């Protein structure tokens, strides 16, 4: 659970909204919390804070659509 909380914290920082911590199933793109520039910022933050490199080609909005799904994808990449 600690890893997920770390991921949620990074997403909240990039989105500038703690709602992602409170509701990890929120659709961050549909709700306007993250856009294409935010996506790049998120991937850079993930790499710098978690040491996980996510190629932009691996980032599919339909798969990486909620904080929970992002945490699950990153856990598989660790």
Swiss-Prot record:
GO terms for molecular function: D-alanyl carrier activity. It comes from the Bacteria. Keywords: Cell wall biogenesis/degradation, Cytoplasm, Phosphopantetheine, Phosphoprotein. Pathway: Cell wall biogenesis; lipoteichoic acid biosynthesis. InterPro entries: ACP-like_sf, DltC, PP-bd_ACP. Residues 1-78 form the Carrier domain. 4'-phosphopantetheine is transferred from CoA to a specific serine of apo-DCP. PROSITE patterns: CARRIER (PS50075). It is found in: Cytoplasm. One of its GO terms (biological process) is lipoteichoic acid biosynthetic process. GO terms for cellular component: cytoplasm. Pfam families: PP-binding. Its main location: cytoplasm. The modification O-(pantetheine 4'-phosphoryl)serine is found at residue 36. Carrier protein involved in the D-alanylation of lipoteichoic acid (LTA). The loading of thioester-linked D-alanine onto DltC is catalyzed by D-alanine--D-alanyl carrier protein ligase DltA. The DltC-carried D-alanyl group is further transferred to cell membrane phosphatidylglycerol (PG) by forming an ester bond, probably catalyzed by DltD. D-alanylation of LTA plays an important role in modulating the properties of the cell wall in Gram-positive bacteria, influencing the net charge of the cell wall. HAMAP family: DltC. Belongs to the DltC family. This is D-alanyl carrier protein. It comes from Bacillus pumilus (strain SAFR-032).
